[in-house]
UniProtKB/Swiss-Prot annotation:
Cleaved signal peptide residues: none
GO MF term list: indole-3-glycerol-phosphate synthase activity; phosphoribosylanthranilate isomerase activity
Catalytic activity from the UniProt record: 1-(2-carboxyphenylamino)-1-deoxy-D-ribulose 5-phosphate + H(+) = (1S,2R)-1-C-(indol-3-yl)glycerol 3-phosphate + CO2 + H2O
InterPro entries: Aldolase_TIM (IPR013785), Indole-3-glycerol_P_synth (IPR045186), Indole-3-glycerol_P_synth_dom (IPR013798), Indole-3-GlycerolPSynthase_CS (IPR001468), RibuloseP-bd_barrel (IPR011060)
GO biological process terms on file: L-tryptophan biosynthetic process
PROSITE patterns the record matches: IGPS
Name listed for the protein in its UniProt record: Indole-3-glycerol phosphate synthase
Enzyme Commission (EC) number: 4.1.1.48
Top-level taxon of the source organism: Bacteria
Keywords tagged on the record: Amino-acid biosynthesis, Aromatic amino acid biosynthesis, Decarboxylase, Lyase, Tryptophan biosynthesis
Length: 273
C-alpha cells in the first residue's frame, strides 16, 4: 500500500472507532434496515445504455488532495439537480472530510434533491462504513482494491449486497483486476489516476479494458475532461464514466454535463457518427 493510502487508512480507522463508540453497529443496522429500498445504481446505468446513451456517474466534490479546493461555491443539492438536468445516470458524493472536505450530510442532501441513485465515495476499510452508508441512504459503495486485502474486500462486498446495495470495484493495474474478478459485483472501475504518484493517464483504461471480461461493466474514472476523452475510451469498449473535477469547475454544470455527454459532439471528436 502506498504512503498516502497508509496515511488515509490510519485516520479512517480512527474515524471508524469514534463512530462505533458514538453509535454502535446494532443502532446503525436498525437505521439502515428502516431505509427505503436502494434506487438501483447499476440498473440506472444499464437504462442509459439501453437508450443508446453514455452513462455518467457525476461527482459532487469540493476538494481533493492533489488539486486542493475545486469548487468554492459548493451546494450539494443544487449540484445534484444540475447533474440530473444535464443527463447524469447516477451521483457520486465524496464523504471523506480530511482529504476531500466531504461529509455524509452532503450525500444525504444531494440524494434528497434528486431521484438519482448515489454512490458513497469514500475509503472503506470496515463493514461498519457500509452499513453507515446505507443508513444515510447510499445506493452503492466503492471498494478500492489498492487499499484492501482480499478478505476485507469480500467482507465489504458481502455486507453491501446483504443490504441490497450495488458495489463499484476500483482497480488501477492488472494485479488489482485479477483480485477484483474474484468478487461478485459486475462493476469494475478503472482509475486512470495512480494513487501512489497521482499521475493520471487514459492509457491505463486503454491497457486494462481489453483484459476485463465481457460480463463485467467497465467504468472509466479520473482524467476525463472532454467529449474526445469519452470517445477515446469508447473505442476500448467503455460507455460508463465517473467524472467530477472537470464538471465541478464549470459555472453552468448542467450545460457542461450536456456538452460532455452529447453523442453528436463525441461522434465529431472521433470522426464518426
Amino acid at each position: 500500500m502506498s504512503d498516502i493510502l497508509t496515511k488515509i487508512e490510519t485516520y479512517k480507522r480512527e474515524e471508524i472507532a469514534a463512530a462505533k463508540r458514538a453509535q454502535p453497529l446494532s443502532v446503525v443496522e436498525a437505521t439502515a434496515k428502516a431505509q427505503g429500498a436502494p434506487r438501483g445504481f447499476l440498473r440506472a446505468i444499464k437504462a442509459k445504455h439501453t437508450n443508446g446513451d453514455f452513462a455518467l456517474i457525476a461527482e459532487v466534490k469540493k476538494a481533493s488532495p492533489s488539486k486542493g479546493l475545486i469548487r468554492a461555491d459548493f451546494d450539494p443539492p443544487q449540484l445534484a439537480k444540475a447533474y440530473e438536468a444535464g443527463g447524469a445516470a447516477c451521483l457520486s458524493v465524496l464523504t471523506d472530510t480530511p482529504s476531500f472536505q466531504g461529509h455524509l450530510d452532503f450525500m444525504v442532501a444531494a440524494r434528497a434533491a434528486t431521484s438519482l441513485p448515489v454512490l458513497r465515495k469514500d475509503f472503506m476499510f470496515d463493514a461498519y462504513q457500509v452499513v453507515e452508508a446505507r443508513a444515510h441512504g447510499a445506493d452503492c459503495i466503492l471498494i478500492i482494491m489498492a487499499a484492501l486485502d482480499d478478505a476485507t474486500a469480500k467482507d465489504l462486498e458481502d455486507t453491501a449486497i446483504a443490504f441490497g446495495m450495488d458495489v463499484l470495484i476500483e482497480i488501477h493495474d492488472r494485479a488489482e483486476l485479477d483480485r477484483a474478478l474474484k468478487l461478485r459485483s459486475p462493476m469494475i472501475g478503472v482509475n486512470n489516476r495512480n494513487l501512489r504518484t497521482f499521475e493520471t493517464t487514459l492509457a491505463t483504461s486503454e491497457a486494462l479494458a481489453p483484459l476485463i471480461p465481457g460480463d463485467r461493466l467497465m467504468v472509466g474514472e479520473s482524467g476525463i475532461f472532454t467529449p474526445a476523452d469519452l470517445a477515446r475510451l469508447e473505442r476500448v469498449g467503455m460507455s460508463t464514466f465517473l467524472v467530477g473535477e472537470s464538471l465541478m469547475r464549470q459555472a453552468d454544470v448542467t450545460a457542461a454535463t450536456r456538452t460532455l455527454l452529447a453523442r453528436e459532439t463525441t461522434a465529431r471528436a472521433t470522426g464518426t457518427r
